[in-house]
């Protein structure tokens, strides 16, 4: 069924297809149809960050930036759903075209630029949702906020989403917001993490619950840089790391149509690079922080490879675009079949 739907959707421009798919998934969720139309994955509960996940395969941020289809995605069988990236104020993102398919490589290039309707709109959609499972909210900074004031934007979003989220992801790794990736390193990272940790303790006291914080990092880091990030996350008391975002690399797609477009590359070509980061993080963290692995999962076995590399959970996005809901089941089954 999804194969036919994909053939039709792929005749449209990528962004039109994305918006239409989101509308359809959202409508199916409101009507309760998605669960009936899609075979559900096997039950594989797991506890991470003090949260109970129905299964370890989640939806990565970026597909549902505004929380438009939370119920719909949950009904497809995802063990958790992450929405966003959301910013304090609405913003249109980068000029179109800004989303490109590379079907020969099972890949996507995007330079969306955190297009979203703002954190207040997203919170309205969360309140309207019936979903009771694990919901992650991914936060970022507005395009026109100077990097040296980025902490302010993250704190605004943290304050607003704190009571609505099961966990909160801090996106410092999108390649499509100028200067954002500099926040992954050195004093910039320390200042951000310290500010987040301090504000989180204040919010935990005010609301009587401690919401886990995860940091999403890029795949384009050396082993030494990755080790420094791991140390900073442990020192600051973060709760998880998501590895990874899209890559600026173009290995294997340079000669393909749209392969030279600017933006972040996701899908199959980032699998090896992303899994390597997971392995390095696992060695540095020594089990002290869980790893949520994203990047390049287009087959069920790729999810198992991420878990074997040291991840506790996985997320999919581009693979879902190409393979549909069946990939959720394949990934859950592959993880369930791993030796204990």
Swiss-Prot record:
Q: Which residues bind FMN?
A: 61-65, 85, 138, 171, 216, 244, 267, 296, 317-318
- Give EC number(s), comma-separated: 1.3.5.2
Q: Which pathway does this chain act in?
A: Pyrimidine metabolism; UMP biosynthesis via de novo pathway; orotate from (S)-dihydroorotate (quinone route): step 1/1
Biological process (GO), any one: 'de novo' UMP biosynthetic process
Query: Which ranges form a coiled coil?
Result: none
Kindly give the InterPro entries that the UniProt entry links to this protein. Answer: Aldolase_TIM, DHO_dehydrogenase, Dihydroorotate_DH_1_2, Dihydroorotate_DH_2, Dihydroorotate_DH_cat, Dihydroorotate_DH_CS
Task: Look up the record and name the cofactor or cofactors this protein needs.
Answer: FMN
Membrane topology summary = Peripheral membrane protein
Provide GO CC annotations from the record: cytoplasm; plasma membrane
Q: Where is the active site?
A: 174
Q: How is the cofactor bound?
A: Binds 1 FMN per subunit.
Presence of keyword Mitochondrion = no
* Localization, UniProt: Cell membrane
Signal peptide limits: none
Q: Which CDD domains match?
A: DHOD_2_like
Q: Which UniProt keywords apply?
A: Cell membrane, Flavoprotein, FMN, Membrane, Oxidoreductase, Pyrimidine biosynthesis
Spell out the molecular function terms from Gene Ontology.
dihydroorotate dehydrogenase (quinone) activity
* Catalytic activity annotation: (S)-dihydroorotate + a quinone = orotate + a quinol
Q: Which residues hold substrate?
A: 65, 110-114, 171, 176, 245-246
Principal subcellular localisation of the protein: membrane
The record describes the protein's role as:
Catalyzes the conversion of dihydroorotate to orotate with quinone as electron acceptor.
Q: Which HAMAP family match?
A: DHO_dh_type2
- State whether it acts alone or in a complex, and with which partners, per the record: Monomer.
Checking NCBIfam families in the record gives:
PRK05286.1-1, PRK05286.1-2, PRK05286.1-4, PRK05286.2-5, pyrD_sub2
Q: What family classification does the UniProt entry report for this protein?
A: Belongs to the dihydroorotate dehydrogenase family. Type 2 subfamily.
Give the protein name, as stated in the record.
Dihydroorotate dehydrogenase (quinone)
Give the originating organism.
Pseudomonas putida (strain ATCC 47054 / DSM 6125 / CFBP 8728 / NCIMB 11950 / KT2440)
